[in-house]
Amino acid sequence: MKTSLRMIALVLGAAASLCTALITPSMADAQKYKVFVSTGFDGNTWLSAATNLVTAMSKTKTYKDRIESLTIQSARGDAQVQAQQINAAVESGAKIILMWPFSPTALNRAIRHACEKGVIVITFDSEVTEPCITTHVGINQDYGGAGTAEGLAKLLNGKGNIIFMGGIPGNMVDTRRNAGAKGVFAEYPGIKIVAEAPSMWNPATARQKLAEIVSAKGWDAIDGLWTQTGCYVFSQLQVEAKRDKLLPCAGNGTNGFRVSMLSKGSTPGALNNPGVSMGSPIWVGAYALTLAFKVIDGGSVGKFTLVPMPLVTQENSVLCEKGDLQELIAKKYSCTAVPLSIAPDNFYIDVVSPLTPQLDVYSALSGTVPAGQ
């Protein structure tokens, strides 16, 4: 009996070895993973487009058979809720967590827990101080403020009264961009900040705050605006006031602002609006997903994945008539705006990149994948 049992054990062991040997790389690649996307707040089109792009990337031929599930959650401006969502994602078997963190420090404990469980944690756009993350994908936020501030200073010839509008107070992105901008303005003694208010990264809020400031000070006391959100509504307030010449604005990359910078009459909404625009790339979340699978496949990434953030002026503005993948490739991803009939004025338009070549403007609008991708 002992001999028989020993023989059975040997046979089973050999069979197990044979099965292991027969597992091919393609079969190993068939393993599917749970992906979670955690955003610190919602309510603006930047994050809506960012999560749409992640959704679209997850449905491309490259990744659709490798993802068991994609879960997208928003903490709605509550860091404690976001920490709870991260912990719950870990307990439910997440392999990848992509995160736009609401706080640079309040999530560190939850992130460490995820790292200890072997979860790939990648932050995008907004940063955290916890060093265990796999990588952060984003821009140089200081330059995000400094670059547009320098552009506005040049448009004003180094002097004038400006309104200064940040984003959401206390968020790392807001803090660093504001510091970068004010550092530049400090070098121009002729530029004075005469009013300051938060835009909350919401065009409606920006419009309300700007209307209050203009009502209190009058248009003649204002020479320009630096803002993280609101250049388009700033121009609309001037149009409504029937001002002949628009004041320069430096701000983010909404489609309305970018269209307004185009030559008047070239497309509906074009106003020859003087300004400089630098939008934080929205495709960073989708790119983060590709980096997560790069790590799963044995590749390596640095702790900070810096992505480009071009400065858009009237001189280098390019309108894409369709915004589909074919046109993006033909124009070498130089498009800075699309017609307002395709994407509304409050839609953040920096949604495409050669680093995410499977996606187009419609991927950001609705999470769809271009044909063949």
State the predicted function of each range.
Residues M1, C19, C249-N252:
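Short, amphipathic alpha-helical segments
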Residues M1-L12:
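Bacterial N-terminal signal peptides that target proteins for export
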Residues L5, L22-S26:
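Serine/threonine-rich, low-complexity intrinsically disordered segments
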Residues G13-L22:
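Hydrophobic core
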Residues S26-Q373:
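A residue-level marker of the well-folded mature domains of exported/periplasmic proteins
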